[in-house]
């Protein structure tokens, strides 16, 4: 049974209650199935879906499932994942594109989630990953005056992919 308390402060399934985490307009996230270093992600309340930068995208048609092969960085190693589905995305200019969707684990604010992520070439954009409203529904509130509220503890050095600050 899924419910939301009237005050909006708690969300839960069955007996488990989760207090929403406050996050900034951008946060460090972990993508343990895709790369080792944390990634600086923009929280985009104007977007519905999540999008991750992918370079050199190749579709591998096979049975029973199609797969996608891509790089997270131009010089990085290859990543291969099953394609969950294709999603039609409309950008702010009204242009529609069809994007492949994969599932992966994301770590943020000391929590892990299995999420869907659209893949697209974001090499010319400031942030290599955006998290949209469907992600925020998992139990997050955005404080637009703050950034990087939650740290990622990793032995590897942090990499701010694509940031032009």
Model feature map: region roles:
Residues 2-3, 8-165:
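Pepsin/retropepsin-fold aspartyl endopeptidases
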């Amino acid at each position: 049974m899924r419910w939301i308390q009237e005050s909006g402060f708690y969300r839960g399934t069955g007996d488990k209650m989760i207090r929403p985490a406050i996050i900034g307009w951008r946060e460090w996230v972990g993508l343990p199935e895709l790369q080792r270093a944390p990634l600086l992600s923009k929280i985009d309340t104007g977007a519905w879906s999540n999008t991750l930068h992918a370079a050199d995208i190749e579709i591998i048609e096979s049975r029973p499932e199609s797969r996608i092969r891509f790089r997270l960085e131009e010089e990085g190693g290859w990543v291969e994942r099953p394609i969950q589905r294709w999603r039609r995305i409309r950008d702010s200019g009204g242009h529609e594109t069809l994007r492949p969707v994969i599932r992966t684990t994301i770590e943020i604010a000391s929590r892990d989630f299995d999420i869907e992520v659209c893949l697209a070439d974001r090499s010319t954009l400031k942030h290599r990953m955006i998290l949209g409203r469907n992600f925020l529904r998992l139990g997050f509130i955005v404080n637009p005056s703050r950034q990087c509220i939650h740290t990622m503890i990793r032995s590897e050095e942090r990499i701010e992919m694509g940031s032009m600050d």
